[in-house]
């Protein structure tokens, strides 16, 4: 296999050396941190937080075979961006931007 070929059996690796599972984990890390502030929590986030797959808490990409974590981040990127912008959290904004650009 050449250095330019993609191995299909590697979860979350669509481009060489891009770890989309970890990128999604970092976004969720930031989301949970921002939501610790009660002024940022609302009914929407109360519904989203329980949807975080077990693989996130285990930090195990192999247990997230359906890529649920990445799907959760990418399908909610607009709302995550709004949350992070409202909180004026540059670290979270940058993490989301990286995940969107590399993985979504």
From Swiss-Prot:
Give GO BP annotations, semicolon-separated: nitrogen fixation
Keywords attached to this Swiss-Prot or TrEMBL record, sorted alphabetically, are:
Nitrogen fixation
Q: Which InterPro entries match?
A: CowN
Highest taxon of the lineage:
Bacteria
Please name the Pfam families in this protein's record.
Answer: CowN
Record's function text: Is required to sustain N(2)-dependent growth in the presence of low levels of carbon monoxide (CO). Probably acts by protecting the N(2) fixation ability of the nitrogenase complex, which is inactivated in the presence of CO.
Which family does the record assign?
Belongs to the CowN family.
Write the protein's name. Answer: N(2)-fixation sustaining protein CowN
């Amino acid at each position: 296999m050449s250095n330019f070929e993609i191995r299909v059996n590697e979860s979350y690796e669509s481009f060489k050396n891009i770890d989309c599972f970890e990128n999604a984990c970092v976004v969720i890390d930031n989301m949970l941190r921002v939501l610790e502030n009660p002024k940022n929590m609302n009914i929407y986030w109360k519904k989203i937080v329980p949807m975080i797959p077990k693989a996130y808490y285990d930090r195990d990409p192999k247990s997230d075979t359906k890529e649920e974590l990445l799907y959760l981040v990418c399908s909610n990127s607009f709302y995550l961006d709004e949350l992070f912008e409202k909180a004026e959290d540059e670290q979270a904004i940058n993490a989301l931007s990286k995940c969107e650009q590399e993985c979504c």
